[in-house]
Every structure is written in structure tokens, then in C-alpha cells.
Amino acid sequence: DVNGNADVSGTLDVDGNVRVVGSMSKGSGSFKIDHPLESKKETHHLVHSFIEGPQADLIYRGKVDLVDGKAVVNIDQIARMTEGTFESLNRNIQCFTSNETDWDVVKGSVSGNKLTIECQNTNSTATVSWMVVGERDDQHMKDTDWTHPDGKIIMEPLKEIVQE
């Protein structure tokens, strides 16, 4: 039990939950979980940085130049993850594209770990910004006590009432 300030230099490892009553400031934040691929679960972790929001979303983004009106992006490669990690880690995937070069219409779709971007103009060489958002679907997310059984964050949990 610590009253007042506790200063830690180096790394503080906690096995269990940490609860902060009051504000918390951090220079950065991330999750570090067992790798979701069976072949790496015993030998590797998977690390992602956080973005705060009402869902446990993972965001992948980048830019690509179209060739003959099309581009295919391997999300695992772009994120420097092992092939299959994106599919193991995400569900309810959404894709957003924006043509930065001209007014030609572009659209994107994701199948597996491949983002395919197509332009209405099949000769386009436009530069397209893209963003893919998926909800975390790893076992750690399902096992926490701050998510519903479907993995969605419990946004308005009941307060714990302390009996004296």
C-alpha cells in the first residue's frame, strides 16, 4: 500500500490488473499479447500501439500508387507482421480510400489480408491514401473482464459498491 507518490525507474511488471483512480498520463501506450498465430504463440508476442475509442479497433493505413487503375496491398507485409496475423487479429473490417491525385472515383475492399483498391478509370496512376479498421478479435480481448462475450468493450460498467 503506497500513500503519496511512487516513483519507478526502469520497468514495472504487474501480473494482474492495474486500476488508476484519477488521471493517467503516458508518453505512449500499447498492448503486448501472445501472438495469435498458433505457430508463433509460444515464441513471439504481438505489439500494437493504442488509439483510444469506444471499440477496441486496430488501424492500418498507408498510401499506394495505382497501376492501370488498381493496387493490391498485403496488410501483413505493410504492418511487418507474419502472414496470417491480420486475419487472426481482426473482425468486422472496414476500408476507406481517398484519391489524392485527381477526381477519379476509387474503392477498396479487403479479403483475407489483401486490400484491393480499384479506380473507375482503368488507366489511373493516382496516389491513393487508404485506411483499414478492424475490431480486435484475439483471445486476450475475449478473456478480459471489460468486454462483452462478443469482444466489444463494456462502455458503461456498473460501479463496484464497497460494503463497510
Describe the residue ranges of each PLM region.
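Extracellular receptor-binding modules and their adjoining Ser/Thr/Gly/Asp/Asn-rich linkers
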Residues: D7, D13, N17-E164
